[in-house]
Amino acid sequence: MPKERRSRRRPQPIIRWVSLTLTLLALCQPIQTWRCSLSLGNQQWMTTYNQEAKFFISIDQILEAHNQSPFCPRSPRYTLDFVNGYPKIYWPPPQGRRRFGARAMVTYDCEPRCPYVGADHFDCPHWDNASQADQGSFYVNHQTLFLHLKQCHGIFTLTWEIWGYDPLITFSLHKIPDPPQPDFPQLNSDWVPSVRSWALLLNQTARAFPDCAICWEPSPPWAPEILVYNKTISSSGPGLALPDAQIFWVNTSLFNTTQGWHHPSQRLLFNVSQGNALLLPPISLVNLSTASSAPPTRVRRSPVAALTLGLALSVGLTGINVAVSALSHQRLTSLIHVLEQDQQRLITAINQTHYNLLNVASVVAQNRRGLDWLYIRLGFQSLCPTINEPCCFLRIQNDSIIRLGDLQPLSQRVSTDWQWPWNWDLGLTAWVRETIHSVLSLFLLALFLLFLAPCLIKCLTSRLLKLLRQAPHFPEISFPPKPDSDYQALLPSAPEIYSHLSPTKPDYINLRPCP
């Protein structure tokens, strides 16, 4: 009797799932990015500008400081080049791409984060437009770029072509310590009326950066200012690019007046004994995703949420598995029943054929006996010697027919129940083995999802949020200030000092540098 065959349905290989999960985790590693930001106000890099429209060595010091900065150790290096006396800053080194124009332009193949006022170039006039004859006044255009750059493999070119009035250019790639506090004389009470620079800058900046935090620090005693001297001096440290025969120097200083700490709430330009002082608000932009420099703290995941998620997914998947198994079991049982019916029909047909064959053999034997008896009555020998041929006899093999009768039903020889991998079934009934199978599958799936599902969800969520934040927003903002226009404060809860900001015409007489 042949050995019975048993069909096995082994459990799903857990190792394959684990390898697939580890592959997904490896692909979902966060991309390492780094950003360097420019800021306005205190703690900023500056460049000096001389009468021949060339930069002093302070810009080289800025580039060298950036190349050696511990804050941006892996960022591309800066190089400096002069074309017809005008500086060109390339990042990384140039590869045949140069831009010219009357304004500062930014050409990039990678994506900038939070560019200043959402455009490639931006002019912010602190005063009304000056005529061609006002070479000695302080009518300058203030142009600043806030660039939060991440890793890229393209060419980033930052080019300035200075025509007419020289723009105020500030560079800052990392924070530097505050310069030593200068010894300022007592301030004069003759204030030069300022215009709407603070409110203008705050309002336009707030509307341009929906995904960036605006850092505003107006609290005393510290206030940044730019001192205007009426003579040209060379500087080995950082400076600013300003018109001919003028050098602006930026410091964070304190003002000790009789009214307490000086707070530039309504005046932008005021007189001191050595010249005029230009006050700038300490505004900087911070990307919300990298606002905190402290290492991120690890927050313990709620065990209730993790267990609930894992068990819910496990129960759902196990229910699907049991349902599929039940359907497969039902289909296999129906197939076995049909095969048993066909088997019985075939066995019946074979037995009937065997019976008919036995009857034919009996008829043949009877005919042989009759012929032999007839030949002997006539005086001859039997049939075979008379015709001189060997005698043939019909022999029927009944072994296969006997085996057909010993066959068991197909349902007893093929098991439709799940078998253990080691070919033993613990001697349990079918429904008990199916229950153990379901419970074991539920436990394995719950354990698997409890450890790996939160990691996958967190990885996919972070990747989705990163893709959503990578879309650059460049809102076009044009704000030619009207003489009689009003400007809103940045926030409704801003200090009371900002509610008095109103546009006023500058006093052209007091705008000239003091001797």
UniProtKB/Swiss-Prot annotation:
<keyword id="KW-0325">Glycoprotein</keyword>
<feature type="signal peptide">
    <location>
        <begin position="1"/>
        <end position="33"/>
    </location>
</feature>
<feature type="glycosylation site" description="N-linked (GlcNAc...) asparagine; by host">
    <location>
        <position position="203"/>
    </location>
</feature>
<dbReference type="GO" id="GO:0019062">
    <property type="term" value="P:virion attachment to host cell"/>
</dbReference>
<feature type="disulfide bond">
    <location>
        <begin position="384"/>
        <end position="391"/>
    </location>
</feature>
<keyword id="KW-1032">Host cell membrane</keyword>
<keyword id="KW-1168">Fusion of virus membrane with host membrane</keyword>
<feature type="glycosylation site" description="N-linked (GlcNAc...) asparagine; by host">
    <location>
        <position position="398"/>
    </location>
</feature>
<feature type="coiled-coil region">
    <location>
        <begin position="388"/>
        <end position="420"/>
    </location>
</feature>
<dbReference type="Pfam" id="PF00429">
    <property type="entry name" value="TLV_coat"/>
</dbReference>
<keyword id="KW-1161">Viral attachment to host cell</keyword>
<keyword id="KW-0564">Palmitate</keyword>
<feature type="disulfide bond" description="Interchain (between SU and TM chains, or C-215 with C-392); in linked form">
    <location>
        <begin position="212"/>
        <end position="392"/>
    </location>
</feature>
<comment type="subunit">
    <text>The mature envelope protein (Env) consists of a trimer of SU-TM heterodimers attached by a labile interchain disulfide bond.</text>
</comment>
<feature type="coiled-coil region">
    <location>
        <begin position="330"/>
        <end position="376"/>
    </location>
</feature>
<dbReference type="GO" id="GO:0055036">
    <property type="term" value="C:virion membrane"/>
</dbReference>
<keyword id="KW-0165">Cleavage on pair of basic residues</keyword>
<keyword id="KW-1169">Fusion of virus membrane with host cell membrane</keyword>
<feature type="region of interest" description="Fusion peptide">
    <location>
        <begin position="304"/>
        <end position="324"/>
    </location>
</feature>
<feature type="glycosylation site" description="N-linked (GlcNAc...) asparagine; by host">
    <location>
        <position position="251"/>
    </location>
</feature>
<feature type="site" description="Cleavage; by host">
    <location>
        <begin position="301"/>
        <end position="302"/>
    </location>
</feature>
<feature type="short sequence motif" description="CX6CC">
    <location>
        <begin position="384"/>
        <end position="392"/>
    </location>
</feature>
<feature type="glycosylation site" description="N-linked (GlcNAc...) asparagine; by host">
    <location>
        <position position="287"/>
    </location>
</feature>
<keyword id="KW-0812">Transmembrane</keyword>
<keyword id="KW-0175">Coiled coil</keyword>
<comment type="function">
    <text>The transmembrane protein (TM) acts as a class I viral fusion protein. Under the current model, the protein has at least 3 conformational states: pre-fusion native state, pre-hairpin intermediate state, and post-fusion hairpin state. During viral and target cell membrane fusion, the coiled coil regions (heptad repeats) assume a trimer-of-hairpins structure, positioning the fusion peptide in close proximity to the C-terminal region of the ectodomain. The formation of this structure appears to drive apposition and subsequent fusion of viral and target cell membranes.</text>
</comment>
<keyword id="KW-0946">Virion</keyword>
<keyword id="KW-0732">Signal</keyword>
<dbReference type="InterPro" id="IPR018154">
    <property type="entry name" value="TLV/ENV_coat_polyprotein"/>
</dbReference>
<feature type="short sequence motif" description="CXXC">
    <location>
        <begin position="212"/>
        <end position="215"/>
    </location>
</feature>
<dbReference type="GO" id="GO:0019031">
    <property type="term" value="C:viral envelope"/>
</dbReference>
<feature type="region of interest" description="Immunosuppression">
    <location>
        <begin position="365"/>
        <end position="381"/>
    </location>
</feature>
<keyword id="KW-1160">Virus entry into host cell</keyword>
<dbReference type="GO" id="GO:0016020">
    <property type="term" value="C:membrane"/>
</dbReference>
<feature type="glycosylation site" description="N-linked (GlcNAc...) asparagine; by host">
    <location>
        <position position="271"/>
    </location>
</feature>
<feature type="transmembrane region" description="Helical">
    <location>
        <begin position="436"/>
        <end position="456"/>
    </location>
</feature>
<feature type="disulfide bond">
    <location>
        <begin position="212"/>
        <end position="215"/>
    </location>
</feature>
<feature type="glycosylation site" description="N-linked (GlcNAc...) asparagine; by host">
    <location>
        <position position="129"/>
    </location>
</feature>
<feature type="topological domain" description="Extracellular">
    <location>
        <begin position="34"/>
        <end position="435"/>
    </location>
</feature>
<feature type="glycosylation site" description="N-linked (GlcNAc...) asparagine; by host">
    <location>
        <position position="351"/>
    </location>
</feature>
<keyword id="KW-0472">Membrane</keyword>
<dbReference type="GO" id="GO:0020002">
    <property type="term" value="C:host cell plasma membrane"/>
</dbReference>
